[in-house]
Amino acid sequence: MLRYRQVVGLLQRRNFSAGATSNGSGSSGGDKSGEDLHPIRRTLRLLGNDMRKVKEFFVPKEPETEKVPIPTQSQFHFSGERDKSKEATVPDDFQTHCDVLIIGGGGVGSSIAYWLKEKARDGLNVVVVEKDDTYAQSATRVSVGGLCQQFSLPENIQMSLFAADFLRSARKHFGEEVPLQFTPHGHLMLAGEEHAESLKRSSQLQNELGARNELLTADRLTARFPWLNTKGIALGCLGLEKEGWFNPLALLSNFRRSASGYGAHFISGQVVDFEFKSQTDISVVTDLGSNEGAYTGLEKAVIQLPDGTRRTCKFALCVISAGASSEQIARLARIGVGPGILRVPLPINARKRYMYAINSQAQSAPGMNMPMTIDPSGIFIRRDGLGGNYICVQDSTEEYNSAMIDPQYFAQHIRPHLYNRIPVLGEAQVVDSWAGCYDHNVYDENGILGAHPYYNNLYLATGFSGHGVQQSLAVGRAISELIMDGQFRTIDLSRLSFDRLIVDQPMFELNNVLS
């Protein structure tokens, strides 16, 4: 607690966050006319305020801004509109100052807000800016909600293990939470001869770190899953516990609801620029010893509101967690276009993901024992309830430019693989389809997380390349640890920092697991 107070005090003393208040006005309120100055009454009033703050510390307030109906697993669209009269983006409530500004309010950004406010409560003024508060373009909307530990990197395995523990005790964390609809079930990752050895090594590492899965030969796969064609398959890895799928939009809603209850401010708007401040007392020196002049830091974000007006928000710390838009935000901060270290860009682009709901009433169609099946072709498929419905997903290599569905995509790219791997679903009927984007790290397809090496007040949490939803829980906690403690306290994610781009040490994930 002492360290926490020191951190908060440091934030509040910094010149670029001086005057930050919970309402963004910077004023202390002054003496109220007619205020009762009787010492006993004043003492009782202060005691009542303290007791109310103690209660709010342990139980978040129920915000009125998160009354959005949450879809079922087979309904991946918001089934209602927000009451715009209750939005927290009324100009009078705009935060002109804050301690932490989070750019991007999807799964990762809202998780960061939740963890910061869960720890700091009123000690930190946290503002989240989201340009699309309907999440029509969010990667969370086109997430299959998978939870799986079948990765090849220890960091990814540990983050998913934490997510499993958190989801199993979600009510303890979220209180009266929106049901996450978590369905415990294993994932089945299939591999041909060329990747069988890698799958073995990954499985061994996963079990050493606390996951539980087993390796199945082609014969054992056929015996266990008669609907599965094992031609071209040498080995399969089946998760035995701590795996399954959940409703990603429900998780996002809980993050927002709880963070708002703890006092976080969610702003509907788009960051269109930054304002900088030159600090003459700090010089930038290159590795070769040349002086590049005074350090120029980030001071304010220029935010365009839905009505077209532009406002500025002065921050002590800023986090870029804008998913597929992160590279554009980084360029506004001169990352990728500046001198020295700033020449190194944030290697994120928007990739398109296709999702299909299909139905088969065939007697031999997969039933309750069907795991989330991951085919070497890149097709992911799982059942959706018990009525013969299935969710089928594939990440395309095309860059995202719109949510339009290519009418020939399923027939050309997905149905042939279904015929091959699960023949009974080859004739399944497509009952719904949708497309969206996700943030793809073109450097090594892994998240970029941590402090930027140039700016002393900028953090990154982006580029998770398709598995950001299941990692959002651990990522939010990790960023909160860096901000409040100055280091990772639980899972050491330092290898995922931006520094690996500068020294050219990629962190390749061999098992791309969707979430």
Curated annotation (Swiss-Prot):
Coiled-coil residues: none
Record field: transmembrane: 100-116
Record has Transmembrane as a keyword: yes
Known cofactor(s): FAD
GO biological process, one term: mitochondrial respiratory chain complex I assembly
GO molecular function: oxidoreductase activity
Region of interest: Disordered: 18-37
Membrane-protein topology: Single-pass membrane protein
InterPro entries listed in its UniProt record: FAD-dep_OxRdtase (IPR006076), FAD/NAD-bd_sf (IPR036188)
A single Gene Ontology CC term: mitochondrion
Pfam families documented for this protein: DAO
Location of the protein in the cell: Mitochondrion inner membrane
Keywords: Membrane, Mitochondrion, Mitochondrion inner membrane, Oxidoreductase, Transmembrane, Transmembrane helix
Key word Membrane present: yes
Function: Involved in the assembly of the mitochondrial membrane respiratory chain NADH dehydrogenase (Complex I).
Subunit structure: Associates with mitochondrial complex I assembly intermediates during its biogenesis.
Name used for this protein in its record: FAD-dependent oxidoreductase domain-containing protein 1 homolog
Chain's gene name: l(2)37Bb
